[in-house]
Each structure stands twice: as C-alpha cells, then as structure tokens.
Amino acid sequence: MSLPSPSDDARIAIIACGALSVDISMICEQQGWAVDIHPLPPLLHNRPEQIAPAVEGQIGTLASRYERIAIGYADCGTYGALDELCDRLGLIRLPGSHCYDVYAGADVIAELSAAEPGTYFLTDFLTAGFERLVWRELGLDRHPELLPDYFRHYTRVVWLASRRTPDLERAATRAAERIGLPLQVRDVGGLAADRAGAGKGAGAGAGKGAGAGKGAGAGAGAGAGAGAGAAAASGGLTAALAALVHPR
C-alpha cells in the first residue's frame, strides 16, 4: 500500500510507520512535496525487532523507483537497528526514540516523564484505536484480570493531542477510564501548528549522506543515520519531515 502525494513525478519515497503515515501524507500534500508514502503495519511496534528488517525489505523493493528514500520512523524500540540500517545505506530517519518525541519534542517527553515516571502516553492514533491497538492486543478483552499486571506501574495517562476533536476527547477519556488512571491532555500543537510551520529548507543539520538513491545505499555519509535522525529534535512533525525531504 502506498499513499501518493498529488505529484505524479515523486522522486522521494518515505517508508513510514502506519501510525504516522496519514499525518505524514497530509503534511506532504499541504507542503506540495513530491513524495510517496509507503506505510508499514503499525502493529510492528508490538514486534520492534521486526521493524528494521521490514524497512530494509521495503527499501529493496523501492530503490530502483526513486532518487531517494527516507525513513518515517523514530527508533521505535529497535535499540539502534534502524540507525545501523540508516548508517549503512545513507538514509535519514525521523528524530527521537519514539513517535512521542516526533509529535511533542524529546525535551517535552523527558520533562513529562521526569515529573511523573509512571506516565502512559497516547497519541491521536493510539487514542482513536485504543480498543484494537492496546486493549485487544494485550488480550484484555479476553483476560481483563491482567489489567493490574500491565498497568500497575503507571500513574497517569497523557494524551499528546495533535487534533483535539470531540471524538478524540471522548476516546481519550474512555481509554483512561478503561485503564483506571487520571487523564491529562497535552496539546502538542501538532498538525494545526505544522500547517504554518517549516517549509522547504527547514530542518537544519539534517546530516551528510542524505539518501540511498537508485541502487540503494551508495555513498553513505558520516553520521547519516543517528546524527541525521536527531536533526529535528523539536519543531513538530512538519519540521522533522522537512529534514527528510530537503536535507542539507
């Protein structure tokens, strides 16, 4: 499955986490970037050791079709496997350890976690799909008695709200009630702020060796993975994407 931009001559492919792909596609369309989005299943997050191999497999499929490929993932529990892949092939990924960093900024997540280590984060995607992505995946629909085992160390739910719609507010409230924890909402500006955010050329310091072009991976520059991936440590998803689409 791919989510093409309006342009018919896209020269850049972004292999993206399915949890981010709709937002990424929308931003690329708003910015007029000639980008095709190729999402991978969001439930790979439950098997993070499979993320890097899945990304590499997709790179092999797409390399001959695009001038450049970028990775629409943070580290996402791969413990450096995505950075190793990016370094080896000369690719750039999104900044941060996980998608919470992408939306809110690593400093904000660190601050919230330090203030209350037992913070359970939800993005809009997780909020909307909580029943399927969390409740059923953990087996709590079949074994609700396991709820204390899964969440005993959590003390609050923080929803990182990119779109604060009535439907999502209700979903976040329901999710917190299901877990039995108080809900706090942190508006991350997200897509509303991103619409007026970075355009071409944003995302300074995206790193050398920006892309594996046709033939995937020739000329990986120093620091192309971990250093480049950390290029847009704050500034919202648009700024992070600008660093992928228009690296310096």
Predicted regions and their residues:
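Long, intrinsically disordered low-complexity tandem-repeat segments
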Residues: 198-230
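C-terminal, charge/polar-rich interaction regions
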Residues: 161-203, 227-248
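Glycine-rich, highly charged phosphate/nucleotide-binding loops
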Residues: 48-61
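Gly/Ser/Thr-rich loops at beta-strand to alpha-helix junctions
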Residues: 15-22, 44-45, 72-82, 100-101, ...
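N-terminal basic/disordered segments at the start of proteins
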Residues: 1-31
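A conserved mid-domain beta-alpha-beta active-site/ligand-binding segment of alpha/beta enzyme cores
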Residues: 114-169
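Long, charge-dense
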Residues: 80-133
